[in-house]
Regions:
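Extracytoplasmic ligand-binding site segments that recognize negatively charged/polar headgroups
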Residues: 1-62
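Soluble non-cytosolic domains of exported or imported proteins
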Residues: 3, 33-37, 58-61, 114-118, ...
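Non-transmembrane alpha-helical segments in soluble domains
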Residues: 6-10, 40-44, 64, 76, ...
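Sec/Tat-exported extracytoplasmic proteins
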Residues: 10-17, 46-51, 71, 79, ...
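A generic structural-conservation signal
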Residues: 19, 76, 94, 136, ...
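Extracytoplasmic/periplasmic substrate-binding proteins
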Residues: 48-113, 150-159
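Mature extracytoplasmic/periplasmic domains
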Residues: 109-178
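Conserved C-terminal helix/tail region of periplasmic/extracytoplasmic solute-binding proteins
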Residues: 170-193
């Protein structure tokens, strides 16, 4: 879909990703008015370039597969899928410049099961604690949002479940990987789907 492809196209056309860190202000302002046309024109130019072309994917496993079989020389995709391919021996290198950070939300339904007895809140607190968020990164390369979780991981490296792999370098929220990024703006996309 358009989400993330338009952001990537604007960066490819010269808009600085680093201006998009605070909720996407600069980048998302550029998408107003002629910005959408600018992004679409960049996508068209990339897709019709005689030295390039585009393959659009619709399943998370496709980008590393396309790279591994030589059908494409670069791809966008989810870092966890690229990490898994690397762990399976595929010679891939992730580039973090202008990465797009998106996040998920936890929600508790008022009046739902375990609301009255406090169990739901207890679980939510544990899941979002520094240790709880870091714990999930033992199994998948999707990053915790808390800086304190990265510190927990650094102190416990090698962090990955195999007991050999340092995970912090593979985290999108590792400070080294955050030098130039786009923070997905859910408000923009809620208003412009």
């Amino acid at each position: 879909g358009a989400m993330s492809n338009l952001e990537i196209a604007l960066v490819a056309d010269g808009v600085k990703a680093s201006g998009a860190q605070a909720g996407g202000d600069l980048l998302y302002r550029k998408m107003e008015g002629a910005g959408i046309d600018r992004a679409l024109n960049k996508i068209k130019a990339l897709c019709t370039d005689p030295n390039g072309g585009c393959v659009f994917w619709n399943a998370g496993a496709q980008p590393p597969e396309l790279l591994a079989n030589g059908e494409v020389v670069m791809a966008t995709g989810w870092n966890g899928r690229f990490f898994n391919a690397q762990m399976e021996g595929t010679p891939l290198v992730q580039v973090w410049d202008a990465q797009i950070l998106d996040y998920e939300y936890f929600a508790m339904v008022k009046g739902g099961p375990n609301d009255a007895n406090g169990e739901a809140l207890k679980v939510l607190r544990e899941m979002t604690s520094s240790e709880g968020l870091a714990g999930s990164a033992k199994y998948i390369a999707y990053a915790p949002w808390r800086k304190s979780s990265i510190a927990v991981m650094e102190a416990g490296e090698p962090w990955y479940k195999d007991g050999k792999t340092n995970m912090v370098p593979h985290m999108p929220t590792n400070p080294t990987n955050l030098k130039s990024h786009i923070l997905m703006n859910p408000d923009y996309w809620a208003d412009n789907q």
